[in-house]
Amino acid sequence: MARQVICWCFTLNNPLSPLSLHDSMKYLVYQTEQGEAGNIHFQGYIEMKKRTSLAGMKKLIPGAHFEKRRGTQGEARAYSMKEDPRLEGPWEYEEFVPTIEDKLREVMNDMKITGKRPIEYIEECCNTYDKSASTLREFRGELKKKKAISSWELQRKPWMDEVDALLQERDGRRIIWVYGPQGGEGKTSYAKHLVKTRDAFYSTGGKTADIAFAWDHQELVLFDFPRSFEEYVNYGVIEQLKNGIIQSGKYQSVIKYSDYVEVIVFANFTPRSGMFSEDRIVYVYA
């Protein structure tokens, strides 16, 4: 048996008083049962807030027999709430929150269902994700990102409603070009708003290899070009992302695919003539 674990199943024979949720417990469920030999006992399942030893568990419920949970969360909970041979209960303390087992197959199955990106498992399934210093740096970056995003506020402008309406149409064949020549129209603030509310991919431009490597299949792609970038806009990478297929040659060659990508460009200038088909550009004047 593992020395310290989070999840424990237990049996307490001939209980004298009800159980209660200890401060160290995150979740508790149990019921009174009668065994085949007629013995009365509590059958239950506990999730601790942190890893706890067998000795520690026995201090919480003296006389109980504990075993490390072997099946899934749901199976352990169901076993502690089964109708036969229940006498009383079940009693449940705190909300039962299913989590993903930190195993590669479980994470892969969850990705199929939820569409989550790998980075979203970095905290909950850190062993499956990776055990390395680079993971810690990436996790720290995510914490910094979440803190920054939470502070972003938006002062709405009328042109933003037009973009919102366009996004409701879900047309991956076009490029929305938000043009504001003067500056100060709120283009960057609105781009930040889309990062915060729609998990958009944000870029100020660059080499195709760098952008393709950084893009993690987000459906909404934003290019927020500074005024000084007009002569260096990478029109090819915009087109590739709009098409939902792009080759990344950074570190290792890989082709990334997506069935739907919406691209928005924020700029103080309009695109160079002939770079895109005119019927693919939708202008919004900020």
From Swiss-Prot:
Q: Which GO terms describe its cellular component?
A: host cell nucleus
* Short motif RCR-2, span: 41-43
- Motif Nuclear localization signal in this chain: 50-70, 96-102
Please give the function described in this protein's UniProt entry. Answer: Essential for the replication of all genomic viral ssDNA (trans-replication). The closed circular ssDNA genome is first converted to a superhelical dsDNA. Rep binds a specific hairpin at the genome origin of replication. Introduces an endonucleolytic nick within the conserved sequence 5'-A[GT]TATTAC-3' in the intergenic region of the genome, thereby initiating the rolling circle replication (RCR). Following cleavage, binds covalently to the 5'-phosphate of DNA as a tyrosyl ester. The cleavage gives rise to a free 3'-OH that serves as a primer for the cellular DNA polymerase.
Q: What else is known?
A: The genome of nanoviruses is composed of six to eight segments. In addition, some isolates contain subviral DNAs.
Subunit record text:
Homooligomer (Potential). Rep binds to repeated DNA motifs (iterons).
Name of protein: Master replication protein
